Amino acid sequence: MSEGTWLVGTAGQAVMRSNDRGVTWHRLGLGQPLEFDAVVRSVCLDPAEPRRVYAGTDIGLCVSQDVGNTWEACQTPFTGQMVWKVLVDPRNSSRIFVGTGAPSRAALWRTLDAGLNWERAAVDIPEFCAGVNRPRLLALAFDPVDPDQLWFGLEEGGLFHSRDGGAAWERVDGRLLWPFRSDIHNIQVLANHGKKVVVVACVNAVYRSLDEGQTWTGFLPNDTHGLYYARALSAPLGSESTLYLSLSDGTPGTSSLILRSSDAGESWQVLPLPQQPNSCFWSIAMDPTDHRKVLAGTKYGHLFTSVDGGNSWQKQWREFSEITEVAWSPVVASIQVAHRSVVPHEEAVA
């Protein structure tokens, strides 16, 4: 069975890739709009065509049609700005949302025609904020039940909800329970077997709503696990109720946990790791065609993989510069040997 391609977005080495389960790693070739040492903040597969990969970068939005072999810079109104988040609608690949942020001005952009035209959301986002100086749009989520409902969140600047496909937005973080509720790291919406759930990871709390954000319950990770900082929150494509969450002692952090929920965030199980990670788990992603295959990357470059849904993990030998987002494509990239940037590692080959 093919293991597909691992893609690791980094701040300083663009997108690193492996098509042989981490034995060898390859950086981008020369002569492309996306430099091999670019800052990449977001890596997003097109769920309908996972050989197509979008990257949020320091030059704007880039796209690859061949699992990251070659890249082109998309011509958009936000070209040249830092893109922090990209999300492609799994029901309609032409509908794409993009969030910009520090050092650029934070904004939400929408295209309904695969990038031919872009519209900036009419949302008042301040240029500066208290927590991180300049806001960045980190979180985007589609509603799997109602395609007209969407969510986005800012670090730092609030939680927003749309009921009309993203034309109009309402700020709703005032309904959350604890301080620092405007600092949003991630959002997931799950169908949950007919009992739809919205789950939000704030800097210091994890929230859950069963009524589309009207009321919330939640927990403080520092009280439950001794780690105050909530970061990654991921769900397998099409999952009814499975979630992965990362907790840490801060950013970049010195320790971190991965938790899994099988009941849409009502309860959580700490997953076993083969060793202590060196920093906060920053990104968790699954193969969209096989949810047992999981990648998890830390802020300071550790990469862990699981092929049994997180029951067991392997730390990969290759370590990276700052990891920003990971992705696992089921498509095996055809990587030219000349692009290989590291030699095979003996332990990986064995």
Placement of each model-derived feature along the sequence:
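Extracellular glycan-interacting surfaces
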Residues: 1-350
